[in-house]
Amino acid sequence: MGYTLKLSAGELGRYRLMAEYARDTESTDWAAAGISSGARVADVGCGPGAMLRVLAEIVGPAGAAHGVDQDLDAVAAATGAVAGLGHASAQPGAAAATGLEQGSYDAVMCRHVLGHNGGAELEIVSHLAELSRPGGAVVLVDVDGTATRMHPDDPDLADLTDRYLAFHRARGNHLLAGMQLGWLLEQAGLAVEVFRHIGPLMRIPPGLRPAGWAARDALVVAGFADAADLLRWERAFDRLDRAQPRPWGHVAGFLAIGRRPAP
């Protein structure tokens, strides 16, 4: 599937926020998966590199952090994100055919990719398993896209979410990808060590925009929105930014870790 999220300054900020939240809330899981100083890790579907930078900082110069994304603009952004870190890099490639060396990684991470690749989920996870060394781990993160909530809600922003989900359904994507993670790891021959809900649940900071807004141009091209919708949603975000007290937001995110059998 083509990349649908426009890499604006706001979208890059959203990626950085997600990466820092993940570092704060998933570090114990990462350590259990083998993401630590000196480890070789891969970030498949690395996007603009916010998480790749975090991983590179964790493994340090004694390790390696390699990112892959099919979108050239994302690869360029990721390369910039890890500039100055000689042990980190980003390259173009598909999630199911990365071009990375098989069996060479202590941990392979793939975040928010499977839900955008309906029908190819098992092919992707099987490839991730091949990239991990014997005894290595695959770390998956994805969401239940139907369970995104905000309170107090705004009917216009709820409409944006509904349109974005309809757009994904039309592309054949699986909105419940997060609930598949444990099953996918097992089907790929891995032993599931962790499978849990990770949220987030947080107060929505002013200026934060969801993935649906980043995909607005794609929604228009696909016939799911028009110029009037974009203006209506933009005004709704202006209201959201001024709201006091700040609304609460929840995304039903899931994390799973699968271990490749040791020899």
Task: Enumerate the predicted regions with their spans.
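Conserved catalytic/acceptor-binding region of the Class I
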Residues: V139-P206, F224
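A short glycine-rich, Lys/Arg-flanked "PGG" loop and its adjoining helix->strand segment in the class I
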Residues: L122-A137
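A short SAM/SAH-binding and catalytic strip from SAM-dependent methyltransferases
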Residues: D106-A120
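Conserved alpha-helix/loop element of class I SAM-dependent methyltransferases that forms part
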Residues: E20-S37, V54
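Helix-to-beta-strand junctions that scaffold the AdoMet/dcAdoMet cofactor pocket
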Residues: G60, N117-G118, S132-P134
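A short acidic, Gly/Pro-enriched loop at the edge of an enzyme's catalytic core
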Residues: T98-V108
